[in-house]
Amino acid sequence: MKETIDFLIDTVEARQVLDSRGNPTVEAEVFLECGASGRAIVPSGASTGAHEAHELRDGGSKYMGKGVLNAVNKIHETISPALCGLSSLDQTAVDKLMIEIDGTPNKSNLGANSILAVSLATARASANALDIPLYRYLGDPLSNLLPVPLMNVINGGAHAPNSLDFQEFMLVPHGVNNFSESLRMGTEIFHSLKSLLDQKGLSTAVGDEGGFAPNLSSSVEAGDLLLEAIQKAGFKPGEQVSLALDAASTEFYRDGIYKYEGKSLNSSEMISYLSRLVSNYPIVSIEDGLAEDDWEGWSELNKELGNKVQLVGDDLFVTNTERLRKGIIEKSANSILIKVNQIGTLTETLEAIELAKMSGFTSVISHRSGETEDTTIADLSVATRSGQIKTGSLSRSERIAKYNRLLKIEEELGNQARFAGALGLGPKNI
């Protein structure tokens, strides 16, 4: 083991870079006394929950107001001097100090984008100094579970310029023994779907997350297309490949009513609609089936479908332990989506995952629609043995980067690698 002094933070650098949508984001680089360093770039979302931590943007005319030079300056002028001399191995202390300096409940002073970039870069610097992979540094010797991918192959909602209200229609290729075969299966279905769309004269343009964005009329039409694509690729729906949805219902919820596919539905009617979809399609997971503050509706939804499918809270929980605790008490869901930039530090992210585990909830590690080449979430999914990852479709290199990282991790683990899909899929054992 190296001397503790080797892990002292020397300085933190930061810069403005671009995400996959061409919007500015923050890259941070933490340098240690020993010469090791770690780098991280933060993502950003399009459909963001109202309760997420605050991204610091510049405003003004440059980059349509989305510049992050103010956040970069916060790192140089405030965060770097404060962290100098702290041990990078004490992630909790590093994150706690940044939270204390910020002094706001939603990190609106320093900005969650600046705090998170430094938080993630600190962990990577420690892993690099120890010469071990990030998943091993964040996890333990038993961190060998490769996640089932939830692949967003049809994009709608805020992620695509089409008429679909639901935001994501996902493939869940679980009926194989390893991650690499799961990835192959998803890729073949992706190409099968593209061929079908071509045949039907539908657009094969892709959305923010790399999935196709055809102008379909309904979720039912999207579901039918996916079943056809799965079978055309030679696989069995339900047995080998299941489906998952991200309704992103907050996006079409106004004044207690869900404005969905030309109809006005109350919570009970929306739940009935989701129940019909579950009955008619091999759906194993529904994310944000109801709006972020429709707590009564969520409890009703969980009572209706919680023993049949995974009910994932994204906007509902925003990777926040306080909101997750409320959901646990009120039995509002059975799973949490984990997005590191919703809460803004690695420590708080790990706390949310641990609370979910202790409460019998599953965790789905997730990207954002505005992504980068950073692959931290791939390592995080293996480190925490979450068993599931959402990182987009089978196109766009910022999505593929995470899949390729998981392939490398599986190769490194060799015969110790396990695949979550082979262990069974469902709300109790996904």
UniProtKB/Swiss-Prot annotation:
Binds a second Mg(2+) ion via substrate during catalysis. It is found in: Cytoplasm; Secreted; Cell surface. Mg(2+) binds at D246, E287, D314. It comes from the Bacteria. Keywords: Cytoplasm, Glycolysis, Lyase, Magnesium, Metal-binding, Secreted. Transmembrane segments: none annotated. It holds the Pfam family Enolase_N. One of its GO terms (molecular function) is magnesium ion binding. The active site is at E209, K339. Catalyzes the reversible conversion of 2-phosphoglycerate (2-PG) into phosphoenolpyruvate (PEP). It is essential for the degradation of carbohydrates via glycolysis. Belongs to the enolase family. HAMAP family: Enolase (MF_00318). This is Enolase. It comes from Prochlorococcus marinus (strain AS9601). The lineage of its organism: Bacteria, Bacillati, Cyanobacteriota, Cyanophyceae, Synechococcales.
